[in-house]
Amino acid sequence: MSPQREQYYRIVFLVAAVYDLVLGTIFSFFHPWAFEVLDIADEDPGSGYVPLIGAFLFVIGIAYFLIYRGDLVRNVDLIAVGTLYKLAYSAIAIWFWIVIDDVPHILFPALFGVVDLLMFVAMAECWFTVRRLSAGKGAAAA
């Protein structure tokens, strides 16, 4: 992999880390404020549900940071999990927006869903590239 390509993948994971750490913090500790700012305070379930999702976002943000600063080939499995998370969120958000027509605010699918879809594409490309490299290293070691 070229140094430029590796740097691109690292930037993708750094952006994903910052994005999910910020959203995770907001939805863990400040979700009533966030729902109020979005003018959907009545949609806030008022339980531990939103903070739990926020905590998960925060943890996955840490995982993206670990990918960013680590060895991409050695982290190929972590890259796969992070990539699948971006696919899961974007698919569910866009499905509920377009097919079911039931989202608390357009921002969830139109911004967060689309951003996660774009990140999914970049991360999937990274995963395929790194997986090929890791397969080559495994064959060379045998």
Q: What do the predicted segments below correspond to?
A:
Residues 1-19:
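Cytosolic juxtamembrane helix and N-cap/initiation of the first transmembrane helix
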Residues 18-27, 45-69, 81-91, 117:
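Core segments of alpha-helical transmembrane spans in multipass integral membrane proteins
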Residues 38-47, 76-79, 103-114:
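Non-cytosolic membrane-interface motifs at loop->transmembrane helix junctions
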Residues 62-77, 97-100:
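Juxtamembrane helix-break-helix junctions at the cytosolic face
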